[in-house]
UniProtKB/Swiss-Prot annotation:
Origin superkingdom: Bacteria
Similarity remark: Belongs to the ribulokinase family.
GO molecular function ontology, one term from the record: ATP binding
Biological process according to GO: L-arabinose catabolic process to xylulose 5-phosphate
Protein name: Ribulokinase
Cellular component aspect of the GO annotation: cytoplasm
Length: 567
């Protein structure tokens, strides 16, 4: 916390949640945890599909999307507050997707904000789900396992992903000479926003978050921070010759203040100049805090993908490296505890893919009959809900297709972004609701595989929490997860836990609470309901899960990289 101690009574903290499609701002009462108001604004360029090529797995965000959406969201929400409430805003916390890094120049400006790079996707933020760096990730993994160096992937699950910091930097550096020559460093989105608002974007002034550095950047205290110069140079000399080395050494947990909002940003956002910026972290880590997570509770943040967070104590973990996950980092969730991350690369995105597939005739009809567009759009928007209801009325598992949930690769266990979705066991009687039931089961099977990855390595899971829009709005899907995992599944009573977690850290940084656990007791959200496994369905899903595992073992070798034959 800061040196200033303020009363939580009446104090308001803002949480900024930068998602894949939009930014959300949430105003929270620091004393009682009341969610006072919220606003969501979509990214305008992203909404138009600019700078993205889905077929090449390229997904980029222009920094102006973040700036414009954030400014609009905060200003619109602040206008609805009373003047007294506005003056009682004490802090802003920030979470974002990750790894979502961007190149910056000597002044700390993201390159795409410069006229010479304004429309260059390589000068923008490389979104978490961008998989253009698969080959670079494999290079990093080979070097980690070569024996030439220590295994710097040891504490990130043993597999470095194409979704992460160094793989993306390496890919862009090689693909774009102009970006390579202009960039002196790279920054994660969750670190950039607090730096932007506090005027600390110069590379030497940036406060790097423990969460992003430990989970995605190979930072670990046992080797003094980032991997040594020789390791990065062995990947590509540009990583140490063209970029600052070390890019950073120290990292900070998110309750530490980054600085005070600048006068310019206070005026632009309609906020007091006394507002404190807390450190940034990834959305799901802050979501776990907002959900009130306790040690050995698996928190599933469910959206387009999932991120699974678990907190463990150092005594139980010791010096063990937990294999197959996305990292174990002290302080990445709660200070003093080891935060562990896992996840599924596609959850809601799988359902959306299926909906888009079935909607093709609707789109064609809308082109030929424009006057039908309103009705066709309504049918499309209700499609997933209709499929879910139809399957729930007759959830037969006798002929359920077995689907592998690798439509966007696999994050956990053992990250592998080369993998593709697989649909098996179709017959002439398979209809759309039944196939959608296979998709629901697939996402639940992926969730169970993550749970077993922890438990098989003596990391117990005492409780399972689910949060996010799907968790609250889709009881059928959540019941399948409870049945497949054979665990009670607690549903958190908020769609805004990530923003709430960010607000909790802001409250601590501003001095409204002494520490994060105290702030959680006052501000974290409650459990809305608990789903209990159905013993009959548990047995039936167990048989399907075994088939799922068999298909996983059969299918994965087919996606191994092809060895190039040199003649």
């Amino acid at each position: 916390m800061t040196g200033n101690v303020i009363s939580a009574d009446g104090a308001i903290a803002l949480g900024l949640d930068f998602g894949s499609d939009s930014v959300r701002v949430l105003a929270v009462d620091c004393q009682h945890g009341t969610e006072i108001d919220t606003e969501v604004v979509y990214y305008p360029r992203w909404k138009k599909g600019l700078y993205c090529q889905a077929a090449q797995n390229q997904f980029r965000h222009h920094p102006l999307d973040y700036i414009e959406a954030m400014e609009q969201a905060i200003r619109q929400m602040v206008k609805r507050l009373s003047e007294e409430q506005r003056q009682h805003i004490v802090g802003i916390g920030v979470d974002s997707t990750g790894s979502t890094p961007a190149p910056i120049d000597e002044q700390g400006q993201v390159l795409a904000l410069r006229p010479d790079f304004a429309d260059n996707p390589n000068a923008m933020f490389v979104l978490w789900k961008d998989h253009t760096a698969i080959e670079e990730a494999e290079e990093i993994n080979r070097l980690c396992r070569s024996g030439e160096f220590a295994d710097y992937s040891r504490y990130i699950g043993g597999v470095y992903s194409s979704e992460w910091f160094w793989a993306k930097i390496l890919h862009v550096t090689r693909a774009d000479v102009a970006v390579r020559e202009a960039a002196v460093s790279w920054i994660e989105l969750c670190d950039w926003v607090p730096a932007l608002l506090s005027g600390t974007t110069a590379p030497q002034d940036i406060q790097r978050g423990r969460c992003s550095a430990g989970h995605k950047s190979l930072w670990h205290p046992s080797w003094g921070g980032l991997p040594p110069r020789a390791f990065l140079a062995a990947l590509d000399t540009s990583l140490v010759n063209d970029l600052d080395y070390p890019m950073f050494t120290d990292t900070y947990t998110a309750e530490r203040p980054v600085g005070q909002i600048t006068a310019e940003w206070a005026e632009r956002l309609g906020l007091p100049t006394t507002v404190i910026l807390s450190g940034g972290a990834f959305d799901c880590h802050m979501g776990a805090v907002g959900a009130g997570a306790q040690p050995y509770t698996l928190v599933k943040v469910i959206g387009t993908s999932t991120c699974d967070i678990l907190i463990a104590d150092d005594q139980r973990v010791g010096d063990r490296a937990i294999a197959g996950i996305c990292g174990q980092v002290e302080g990445s969730v709660l200070p003093g505890w080891i935060g562990m991350e896992a996840g599924q690369s596609a959850f809601g995105d799988m359902y959306a893919w299926f909906s888009n597939l079935l909607s093709w005739p609707l789109h064609q009809a809308a082109l030929t009959q424009p006057e039908w567009q309103p009705q066709l759009k309504q049918i499309e928007s209700n499609l997933l809900a209709s499929l879910t209801r139809a399957w729930a009325q007759n959830p037969s598992l006798d002929h359920l297709p077995v689907v592998l949930d690798w439509f966007n690769g696999r994050r956990t266990p053992n990250a592998n972004q080369r993998l593709k979705g697989v649909i098996t066991d179709l017959n002439l009687g398979t209809d759309a609701p039944t196939l959608f039931g296979g998709f629901i089961a697939a996402t639940a099977f992926g969730a169970r595989a993550i749970m077993e990855c922890f438990e098989q390595q003596d990391i117990p899971i005492d409780n399972v929490l689910a949060l996010g829009g799907i968790a609250r709005k889709s009881p059928v899907i959540m019941q399948v997860c409870a049945d497949v995992m054979n665990r009670p599944l607690q549903i958190v009573a908020s769609d805004q836990c990530c923003a709430l977690g960010a607000a909790i850290f802001a409250a601590v940084a501003a001095g409204a609470h002494d520490d994060v656990p105290t702030a959680q007791r006052h501000m974290a959200c409650n459990i809305e309901r608990t789903l209990i496994p159905d013993p009959v369905q548990v047995v039936r899903y167990q048989q399907l899960y075994q088939r799922y595992q068999q298909w996983c073992h059969t299918a994965e070798p087919h996606y191994a990289p092809v060895t190039k034959v040199i003649h």
